């Protein structure tokens, strides 16, 4: 029983110290899995705080599991610039949780995303993110052009740098 109480107190201390977004100068790196129709892959983001509740960054994806044959590197790779509104503290969430809606501009489209981060410690947490295209550069996409140009779901690990 003594060990359980000690472990609980240690976890509480770590959770109380963790901060999901601290504002200007805050740097986050995320890596995880990306899921979309007919493909799965790996993704990574880097976000840099430019204000109390704003960050800018980059997002990249490479699809590893594409259904069917015939896709090439250009179909499977994507790169985006992104802007986030980090609103966890605005809506009254604990400091180790952040919610961030945002906009992104990529190689295939202009889109929006909604994500959330939960930090267990000051340096490590988990995240999940949904993204949708708002305006596609090609009005009629088909076949492999649909990859990285549709609704996506990502989840993985988040790190404070």
Annotate each PLM feature:
Residues 19-26, 52-53, 88-99, 122-123:
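Short loop/turn motifs that connect adjacent beta-strands in outer-membrane beta-barrel proteins
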Residues 31-43, 66-75, 102-113, 141-150:
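Solvent-exposed loop/turn segments connecting transmembrane beta-strands
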Residues 20-29, 58-77, 97, 136-147:
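Flexible, solvent-exposed loop segments that connect beta-strands
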Residues 29-33, 58-60, 81-83, 101-103, ...:
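Membrane-embedded beta-strand positions of outer-membrane beta-barrel proteins
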Residues 1-25:
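Bacterial Sec-dependent N-terminal signal peptides
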Residues 79-85, 148-161:
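Outer-membrane beta-barrel "beta-signal"
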Residues 33-37, 60-66, 85-89, 105-109, ...:
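Transmembrane beta-strands of outer-membrane beta-barrel pores
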Residues 16-56, 160:
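Short glycine/proline- and aromatic-enriched beta-strand/turn motifs that initiate or cap beta-hairpins
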